C-alpha cells in the first residue's frame, strides 16, 4: 500500500467507526481462508462487515471517533467487525467464536462505551433491535386480536345455532 492508499483506507475506516453502532476487535490467528469467508458472510447477512486492518492504520482511524478508547486492543493479528445495529456485530462474532476457538474476542465499543471481552459477550446475549420491535408489535397486537375474537364469537355462535336449527328442520 502506498501513502495515498493508506490515507484513503484510514479515512474510509474512520467513517466506518463513526457510523457503526458497535465495533468488535478480535484476534484471528490460525483461521483459514474458508473460515474467514464464513465469518464475513455471516456478518454480511447480519448487516455488518469484517475488515482486517494494519494495527497502526486502525489506531490512526480511531482518532476523533467515539470508539477511540479501544485503540490499545490493536496488537497482533486483529480483525475488526462492525455493524449499524449495536447488537449484530457482537452477536455474530460471539457465535462464531463459540464454534471456532481460533477467533478470540478482545473487546469492542458501543458508541463512547469501551467494552472488554465479557462486555461484548453480554451485549451479544441481548435481543437485536428487530427482535425487540417484533416483541413490541406482538404485545400491541395481542389485545386487539383478543378483542376481535370476543366480538366475533357471539355472531359465530348465533350463526351456528341458526345453522343447526335449519338442519334440524330439514331432517324433520
Curated annotation (Swiss-Prot):
<keyword id="KW-0694">RNA-binding</keyword>
<keyword id="KW-0687">Ribonucleoprotein</keyword>
<comment type="similarity">
    <text>Belongs to the universal ribosomal protein uL10 family.</text>
</comment>
<keyword id="KW-0689">Ribosomal protein</keyword>
<comment type="function">
    <text>Forms part of the ribosomal stalk, playing a central role in the interaction of the ribosome with GTP-bound translation factors.</text>
</comment>
<protein>
    <recommendedName>
        <fullName>Large ribosomal subunit protein uL10</fullName>
    </recommendedName>
</protein>
<comment type="subunit">
    <text>Part of the ribosomal stalk of the 50S ribosomal subunit. The N-terminus interacts with L11 and the large rRNA to form the base of the stalk. The C-terminus forms an elongated spine to which L12 dimers bind in a sequential fashion forming a multimeric L10(L12)X complex.</text>
</comment>
<dbReference type="InterPro" id="IPR002363">
    <property type="entry name" value="Ribosomal_uL10_CS_bac"/>
</dbReference>
<dbReference type="InterPro" id="IPR043141">
    <property type="entry name" value="Ribosomal_uL10-like_sf"/>
</dbReference>
<dbReference type="GO" id="GO:0015934">
    <property type="term" value="C:large ribosomal subunit"/>
</dbReference>
<dbReference type="GO" id="GO:0006412">
    <property type="term" value="P:translation"/>
</dbReference>
<dbReference type="GO" id="GO:0070180">
    <property type="term" value="F:large ribosomal subunit rRNA binding"/>
</dbReference>
<dbReference type="InterPro" id="IPR022973">
    <property type="entry name" value="Ribosomal_uL10_bac"/>
</dbReference>
<dbReference type="GO" id="GO:0003735">
    <property type="term" value="F:structural constituent of ribosome"/>
</dbReference>
<keyword id="KW-0699">rRNA-binding</keyword>
<dbReference type="Pfam" id="PF00466">
    <property type="entry name" value="Ribosomal_L10"/>
</dbReference>
<dbReference type="InterPro" id="IPR001790">
    <property type="entry name" value="Ribosomal_uL10"/>
</dbReference>
<dbReference type="InterPro" id="IPR047865">
    <property type="entry name" value="Ribosomal_uL10_bac_type"/>
</dbReference>
